UniProtKB/Swiss-Prot annotation:
Sequence-specific transcription factor which is part of a developmental regulatory system that provides cells with specific positional identities on the anterior-posterior axis. Binds to sites in the 5'-flanking sequence of its coding region with various affinities. The consensus sequences of the high and low affinity binding sites are 5'-TAATGA[CG]-3' and 5'-CTAATTTT-3'. Belongs to the Antp homeobox family. Deformed subfamily. Residues 17-148, 267-309 are annotated as: Disordered. The proline stretch works as a part of the transcriptional activation domain. Residues 274-294 have a biased composition (Polar residues). The keyword DNA-binding applies. It comes from Gallus gallus (Chicken). SMART domains: HOX (SM00389). This is Homeobox protein Hox-A4. The keyword Nucleus applies. GO terms for cellular component: nuclear body; nucleoplasm. It is found in: Nucleus.
Length: 309
C-alpha cells in the first residue's frame, strides 16, 4: 500500500522500453530499435534530482523511508547510450536470437537424409516444433538387443497378419528358441525317484531296487535304542514325536522298532509269536503248569487235621 501510494503521488518517471513485437518482425526491426529513443532528458544534461516525497505521505504513513526506490531515476538515464552518430544497422534479432529447435529429433533426419542432398518432406519448418519422429525401418543406428521372449512375442504377433498357416510354427517356437528358461527347472533323474510297488511285477528286470534301505546315523540309532530301553512298544503319538525329532518318517520308526523287538526276542531265546505252532503250549500255560508242580494237592486224610489245627 505504501509503495503504490508513493508511485501515484510522486513525479516518478516510468522508463519506457520498446515493445516486444518489434523483436519478432523480420524487416525494419533493427532500424526501429536503433532509432527508437524514449522521451528522456538530453544525455549531456545532468540527471534531475529525485523529487521529494509529498508531506502528506509521511504524515499518513510514519516510518522510515524506502531508499531503494529513490536511486532508480539516477540509474535509469545511465542505460541510455551517449549521443553518437548512428552507425550501420545491426543484425536482425533473428540472427541474435535464433529459434530454438530441439536437437534430439535431428538425428533420425540426418541419418535418413545422409545419402541425398535435398532434405526429405518429413523435415519440419524451422519455426514450428517438429512432430515426434516415426520409427525408421532402415535405421542404421545401434538397436538395443531384444530378449528372447520379446522377439518371440513379436514374431507371433506378426504371424496372424502373414497368414493362418504360421499358427503351428508359433506354438513350436518356445521349445526351440527358449532353451535357457527350461534349464532353470529342477532336473529329476531316475535314481532320484522312489518307486513303491505293492505287487510283484513279473516283467521286472531288476535294474532298479524296489525300495532303498534306510541307513540310520549313529545319533538316530542311539536315540532309538534309548527309547526302546524304556518302551518296546510305541504309541502313535510317541512315534510321531520321535519321527519329527530324528527327521525320520513314521514308517521308518515303526519298522525299526519291529526289527528291534525281533532281535530282542532272539537274544532272550523267547519263542517267536508269529512262527509259533499250534501244538506248542503258550507261555501262560507253561507258567500255570510249573505252579501246580511246585505246590502238590493235599491228601484226603490230612484235611481234618488241617481243619482241627
Amino acid at each position: 500500500m505504501t509503495m503504490s501510494s508513493f508511485l501515484i503521488n510522486s513525479n516518478y518517471i516510468e522508463p519506457k522500453f520498446p515493445p516486444c513485437e518489434e523483436y519478432t518482425q523480420h524487416s525494419g526491426s533493427a532500424g526501429s530499435s536503433a532509432s527508437y529513443h524514449p522521451h528522456h532528458p538530453h544525455p549531456h544534461a545532468p540527471p534531475p534530482p529525485p523529487p521529494p516525497p509529498p508531506p502528506h505521505l509521511h504524515a499518513a504513513h510514519p516510518g522510515p523511508a524506502l531508499p531503494e526506490y529513490f536511486p532508480r531515476p539516477r540509474r535509469e538515464p545511465g542505460y541510455q547510450a551517449p549521443a553518437a552518430p548512428p552507425g550501420p544497422p545491426g543484425p536482425p534479432p533473428e540472427a541474435l536470437y535464433p529459434a530454438q529447435a530441439p536437437s534430439y529429433p535431428q538425428a533420425p533426419y540426418s541419418y535418413s537424409s545422409a545419402g541425398s542432398a535435398a532434405p526429405g518432406p518429413e523435415q519440419p519448418p524451422p519455426g514450428a516444433s517438429p512432430p515426434p519422429p516415426p520409427p525408421a525401418k532402415g535405421h542404421p543406428g545401434p538397436a538395443q538387443p531384444l530378449l528372447p521372449g520379446h522377439a518371440l512375442q513379436r514374431r507371433c504377433e506378426a504371424a496372424p497378419a502373414a497368414g493362418a498357416g504360421t499358427g503351428p510354427g508359433c506354438a513350436l517356437l518356445p521349445d526351440k528358441s527358449l532353451p535357457g528358461l527350461k534349464g532353470k527347472e529342477p532336473v529329476v533323474y531316475p535314481w532320484m525317484k522312489k518307486i513303491h510297488v505293492s505287487t510283484v511285477n513279473p516283467n521286472y528286470s531288476g535294474g532298479e531296487p524296489k525300495r532303498s534301505r534306510t541307513a540310520y546315523t549313529r545319533q538316530q540309532v542311539l536315540e532309538l535304542e534309548k527309547e526302546f530301553h524304556f518302551n518296546r512298544y510305541l504309541t502313535r503319538r510317541r512315534r510321531i514325536e520321535i519321527a519329527h525329532t530324528l527327521c525320520l518318517s513314521e514308517r521308518q520308526v515303526k519298522i525299526w522298532f519291529q526289527n528291534r523287538r525281533m532281535k530282542w526276542k532272539k537274544d532272550h531265546k523267547l519263542p517267536n509269536t508269529k512262527m509259533r505252532s499250534s501244538n506248542q503250549p503258550s507261555l501262560g500255560q507253561q507258567q500255570a503248569k510249573a505252579q501246580t508242580q511246585g505246590h502238590p494237592r493235599p491228601l484226603d486224610g490230612a484235611a481234618p487235621n488241617a481243619a482241627a489245627l
